[in-house]
Amino acid sequence: MRVIASSIRKGNVLEQDGKLYVVLSAENIHPGKGTPVSQIEMRRISDGVKVSERYKTTDQVEKATIEERNYTFLYEDGEGFHFMEPESFDQVQVTKDVVGNSAPYLAENMVVKLSMHDTTAVAITLPQRATLEVVETEPVTKGQTASSSYKPAILSNGVRTAVPPHVGVGTRVVVLTEDGSYVERAKD
């Protein structure tokens, strides 16, 4: 489907010269003189090459049709990440380029949304929050309840984050999968 360049947003998938590109960032620039343009940073899905394009805001570009479906994460091996569609039990393999920074948060049997173009996965959406265990941090310091300072910690998936002073090793915490930031102590 053809759309004007100014309507392209991060996460959209474009089709150019028979190849698919996922939009990393899109910015509309309105100079004082001259024609407004859309500056678009994209990554080619087939090989991960980053491309920067500049279009007039009124130019037409081809937006690929994408279908979002729930998949269950099975396992990771040297070839990539393997997911299963729960209703048909069809398995799909997703490359490391598509999974990107989401890889540490993937847990066995986790339900994620895969954006599919035909039979190719082009993007992954994790649940907003993940519950993980703190495996390394400074010892709990008594009497530091008034300050809002955070201390560094390493979680069970290897991600570094900052936690409040009262959180110790072995504590289960809830973090945002988008950036790994601490939300709260787990209630389990």
Swiss-Prot record:
Assigned GO CC terms: cytoplasm
Record-level GO BP terms: peptide biosynthetic process
Compartments where located: Cytoplasm
Main location: cytoplasm
Keyword Cytoplasm appears in the UniProt entry: yes
GO terms for MF: translation elongation factor activity
SUPFAM superfamilies: Nucleic acid-binding proteins, Translation proteins SH3-like domain
Coiled-coil blocks: none
Keywords associated with the record: Cytoplasm, Elongation factor, Protein biosynthesis
Pathway the protein contributes to: Protein biosynthesis; polypeptide chain elongation
Similarity comment: Belongs to the elongation factor P family.
NCBIfam families: efp, PRK00529.1
General function of this protein: Involved in peptide bond synthesis. Stimulates efficient translation and peptide-bond synthesis on native or reconstituted 70S ribosomes in vitro. Probably functions indirectly by altering the affinity of the ribosome for aminoacyl-tRNA, thus increasing their reactivity as acceptors for peptidyl transferase.
Protein name, UniProt field: Elongation factor P
Source species of the chain: Rhodopseudomonas palustris (strain BisB5)
Lineage of the species this protein comes from: Bacteria, Pseudomonadati, Pseudomonadota, Alphaproteobacteria, Hyphomicrobiales
Recorded name of the encoding gene: efp
